[in-house]
Amino acid sequence: NSLEKNPDLRDLRNETLVGVLDGKILVHNHCYRADEMATMINISDEFGYKVSTFHHGVEAYKIADLLADEGICAALWADWWGFKHEAYDMSIANIAIVDQARGGKGCAIVHSDDASGIQRLNQEAAKALAAGRKAGFDISEGRAMTWITKNPAKSLGILEQTGTLEEGKDADIVIWSGNPFSIYSKAEQVYIDGALAFDKASNFMPHTDFDLGVKEWEDK
């Protein structure tokens, strides 16, 4: 064993496992089905580590109370499912059900690993909000906003740094032309760490992908 011969040699695999067991590394699991997620929770309980978030979680609504009890977030699609066997049994109110579990103690996140969906994550949240209200849940727009702000920060373990508008946190802010959940609203300004990173009114910034292409062509 190389570690026995050289105890100063780092074992990156076990070092990572130690970080997980010590709670310094947050575990994110990719699961679709409820039984898969429940099994992973049982395994985490057996070996003494914490699952931070389940990703995709098409059947998360089936174990929403369990997720809330365990303090586990679920990063979910608003309305995408059925593309393979384990993704068939979806509820359009999945995000809302997870959010409202145990009297609103759930941690739901609107997720998208699609290039178009992530560009319009606010609209994905709007669809999830509409589905939840249609299902009978009384969910405010402010609550729905946490699905793409506060809860992702909590999931990543950086809530003390970002995720909400509070004094002392990173000033990562988007100024919208209207209601962020409206398809007609556009990002007017974007601030990152308090510095203006995008200004729609500025003539120095391209406004569309077409403008970007034209600029690249002109620079050649």
Q: Which residues does each predicted region cover?
A:
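Acidic, glycine-rich loop-and-beta core segments that form the ion-binding/anion-interacting portion
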Residues: I41-G48, V58-Y61, D69
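Short internal beta-strands
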Residues: T53-G57, A75
